[in-house]
């Protein structure tokens, strides 16, 4: 009797373990003529702190994962990719704990997950210029997002 209880309990646990591995979060579009455009707004607050960066990475990973199921045609970003464009030392804690170079490197890498998978359009914001907030027109944007990378190359779709 004791062995049967242990066997039944083992089978129940095995079943629950297998059930836990099923991806039940399957997004899809009901209308076959529909498509999606993903909007990533103001990433600066995810980028300026190292502990917030995984949130933005998750956003680009989710987007890359759902390109086919949601028929994503483009990704739009509303700018302010970084909090400070040209800050050599990490600013005061309120403004982030990373240098500008670290912020640019991260946001470029995060968007790299979408390279050659879906076109993305990035609008720069005031934080992406000058030393801190657009006091001049100097930006590091072309250094991290060269025109070759951003060109809207047609990605062929099966007919």
Regions found by a protein language model. Give the residues of each.
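Bacterial Sec-dependent N-terminal signal peptides
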Residues: 1-22
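A generic hydrophobic-helix recognition signal that picks specific residues
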Residues: 5, 35, 73, 118-119
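Alpha-helical transmembrane segments and their juxtamembrane interfaces
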Residues: 12-14, 52, 90, 153
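Short, structurally constrained coil/turn elements
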Residues: 14, 31, 68, 114-116
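N-terminal active-site segment of His-dependent metallophosphoesterases
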Residues: 20-98
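Extended active-site neighborhood of metal-dependent phosphoesterases/phosphodiesterases
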Residues: 87-156
